[in-house]
Amino acid sequence: MKTNFINTTHIEGLLYDHTLEIKVTGENSKHPGTQYLRGDISVVTDSKLMNVVQVYYSYVTATTSAGKADSRWSSLMDIINGKRKTVVANGADQASIIRIDSAIGFNEFYTDSRENPGTQELVSAKRNEGGFIHFDGTGENGLLLADEHKRATFKNDIVITSVIEREANEERNLPAKAIVKGWVFVFRKAIYPVEFSAIEPNAMNYFLGLEASTKNPVITQVWGEQDSETTI
């Protein structure tokens, strides 16, 4: 069985907005009084400024554990200090091009259970976590890729345990899809539950045809686009 599982994401576009903050570790931390950066970077990947993808940074210090300068620190500080412009603050014409090679991580939190009122359940919401930052694109002359569909992508090894077919909902403008459920591997050598949606007919047929279940899990690789969407 393979031990090096793939978990990669790629995001490039215009710097849309951010929630980055300078924080200081508490007295009970391993390194008290250490400054670090935390927050989200939002990147808009399409010309219509509709597909906004976030990348979360939980703990970035000026130096790495090996004592070397961490390039992420200077990049994030450039954003905080306004050296790098955002769509929200400065408009799309002045916004900086940004590229981040990240990975899928998870934000775990408790929320009220719909199935069991009065109780709470643990939710693992997937998100892009960390990664090195470049202020250019992978297109010609450092510009953004011409194909917008390649500007926010993911590739993951996955253990599929369920595939559910969902019909289209015309009233809510939702397409038919196959919901792929399973487990993915993160850099901490941990596994987390995850869902992906397949909307292309060939992809739907492939995943539904696997007949995956908890008793018959299927290990494979999935890849595709990251689309932000608002469901009404």
Please name every model-derived segment.
Residues 1-232:
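OB-fold and OB-like single-stranded nucleic-acid-recognition modules
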